[in-house]
Amino acid sequence: MNILIIILLAVAAYLIGSFSSALWYGKWFYGIDIREHGSKNAGSTNVLRVLGWKCAIPVFITDVIKSFMPTMFFVMLLNRFATTDCGIFAEQGSEAYYLYQLLFGMMAIVGHIFPIFSGFK
């Protein structure tokens, strides 16, 4: 059961990382696909160049939150709901705590680089 929880949280971290805030902010608020303008990159720098700072700031903040959430929040969830009987308890400062942070953070980065919602590109 404990490995299943870790796998589910890692998949959730990947899915959170796959959310392209630049793409969605551009579509929702400006009606454009940011990947068709500027450097054709769905990133906050391209949003800044094409749409300006009023759109780039929320895109950047959303990108920071989507990397922070899996690394810190998921480890706090593990500590809150998992018991030492499950073998996944990660006390702050322990080796497991940092390994889970690295795992979930790396999955969010992989999701950011290869987003499933944008066809892995």
Regions found by a protein language model. Give the residues of each.
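Cytosolic, membrane-interface loops and tails of multi-pass inner-membrane proteins
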Residues: 23-56
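Alpha-helical transmembrane segments
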Residues: 2-26, 54-121
